[in-house]
Amino acid sequence: MTPVQVPNLDVSVTSSLITTAPVTGNAATISTFTPGSPEPSMNGEEKESSYFPISENDDGTLDLFGDSELEKEQKGDNQETDYSSQYLHPTPPYTNFDDESPSSPTHPSVSNITVDGDSKKHSLQLQEEEKSSESLDSHTHPPKRVRNEDDSLTFSKTSPVSPSSLKDGASNTVTNDASNKIKSEASESASPSALQALDSTAAGSSKEHSSPHDETVKKEENDKDQYPPMTKEQHKYIHAMLRQLRRGRDSIPFRAPVDPVKQNIPDYPTIIKNPIDLGTMQKKFSSGVYSSAQHFIDDMNLMFSNCFLYNGTESPVGVMGKNLQATFERQLKQLPSAYVTSYSRPGRRPRSMTAPKGGARTRRQAAMYSNSSSGIRETMYDLKPHRRKDAAEMKFCQSVLKELLKKQHEAYAYPFYKPVNPTACGCPDYFKVIKHPMDLGTMQNKLNHNEYASMKAFEADMVLMFKNCYKFNSAGTPVHLMGKKLESIFQKLWANKPDFDSETYMGMSSVNTDYYYGDNEVFDSGDEFLEDDGEEFEAVNRQIHKLQSTLQAMKSRARSSSVSRRSRSRSLSVDIYPPITYEMQNELAEQCNYLSADQLSHVAEILRAALPHLRNTDEIEIDVSAMPPDVFYKVYYYVCKGDEIGAEALATASHTHQEKKKGRALSETEQAEKIRQLRAQLDRFSGIAQNKNTVTGNIAAYNTKSLGSDDSSSEDDGESSESSDSA
């Protein structure tokens, strides 16, 4: 093999680039130098250690890359050293591509140089990526020489993709370049449908390489939206639970934010990135930041995680954190469900404001006076929600259950906290023996969901639970003895239940349920009237009797001004307090946490004296929003102002202001005129009802008693009423 002379050009082939340069002489030598060998001398002397000749193929063309030698060696015809492998796996030094650009001009005489060998066409292609500030230099990431399927060589410079380049959509660079290359190669022979498929593939790949940060943010937003909103029951329970947690001794390190300067822990902000405490959670809860109960639970878990991360679990603060976490998890089991069916009071049936067809003004008889429809009426009453009486009963049941769930009874009450798990307890035949299981947790859930219709239903479930215990566990076993102990506690608590007055309940029910479904109608006629089974008559009659009694008292013996004022204040006045604001309730609840033992005892005495149902209880827990105004202001002035007498002074001042607003009392003449107007109104109702024959038996009896005769005309109503009044 002999060197080949090419006129006017000096072509040198390195492991990474072929360069050309014009020369002044008549001929030039095509030479190469091997990586790792000394560079060729500049004085024109050739060294065998630095050069090896470029051979010719059988057809006389140049073999720049040693393909013919490689083929001969594979066939066993040539035993010389193979130099082509040094090109396929280059080693430093390399040529730097940073000074070049794809748009830089090339020499006109070598712009389209091709070398043919072995009847195959070899193309030399220079390819480089865009310069990037984040890419490494060419010495650490050199260009690579790759042989393609069409036997062409490609020099490419690669650089790793840094994590920062994944932001702002930079991750699509490699994918887009590859898709554009495939698309350009396929555009020559592919159909339009194939090109459309390539476009869709590229679009899909760009979506797959979307920013991971954006996907994380979207996932967090979706998780945040999927939590159910906090219900009223959950809000009340979490408020009480948070107050109870802050009241315990183990919560002392967690009541306020950590002060690194004051506590001399400068590394705390470095270790704990998201600090949280009970005081901050109380503020967030009061301002309505927690839209879901899960958000509150997440903050509580974050507080415990921060504690264990910085203090460990064996330090004093870590032990207090574990105790507080155990209390929180135990209370969290009783959290009401987020999916609670709301019980709403059925509204009134809309009254008809138009006359019936045919102009006939008829009125349905009240169902309460009809024996035939009594069953329907009772059914309609059964559909109504329970009134205040039932609420008081359920509150007592809740207090009994709360007492049984206290920690002091845990030693013998824990088997009844949750439903029996036959697998965990090792009693697979439990449900074969016990057909209707019951436990305290199920009863608590039923109370929270208003599933008990009365106290008897609650008591029946409690008796059922103990009955199941004695049925499955024979006498003398530990669980049987625990059930006996817990049942004795329940019997003592149940024996102290208040005596709910049935007559009071019936009176409240009748007041709240009368005319609930609107049995009367208003007719569109010249003489409109509203008739609700005589209630208007009774109201007018009560006003008449009230004014008559006042008038009779004025005509009686004269009393002194001081005595009369005192009697009027006793009979007509009540202590009126200003409205209780939400800020006052929060202030009272906060200040109660910092009272001493003596102050708490005095507050308990105030509550027991004002609320009889708390007199026999050892521990008092009352909702601030449910306290009567007089009791609230007594406790509020004592706890927040330090002056218990201020509440009475406030009530007196409010009453005096109210009396001034009422104005002067009516004189005898004015009261007589008021009585006359009320009687005229009563006579008008009575006359219309008699003329239309639509008055029920009770109203007719009332007219007979008050007017004397049902046959009197409307013109004589005034005289008949006067005669009946004089009689």
UniProtKB/Swiss-Prot annotation:
Protein name: Bromodomain-containing protein C631.02
Any one GO molecular function term: lysine-acetylated histone binding
Subcellular localization(s) per the UniProt record: Nucleus
Record keywords: Bromodomain, Nucleus, Phosphoprotein, Repeat
Comp. bias regions, Basic and acidic residues: 69-78, 128-150, 206-231
Predominant location category: nucleus
Residues of the Bromo domain: 229-335, 388-497
Superkingdom of origin organism: Eukaryota
Annotated region described as Disordered, given as residue ranges: 27-231, 341-369, 699-727
Chain ranges of the NET domain: 570-650
Phylogenetic placement of the source organism: Eukaryota, Fungi, Dikarya, Ascomycota, Taphrinomycotina
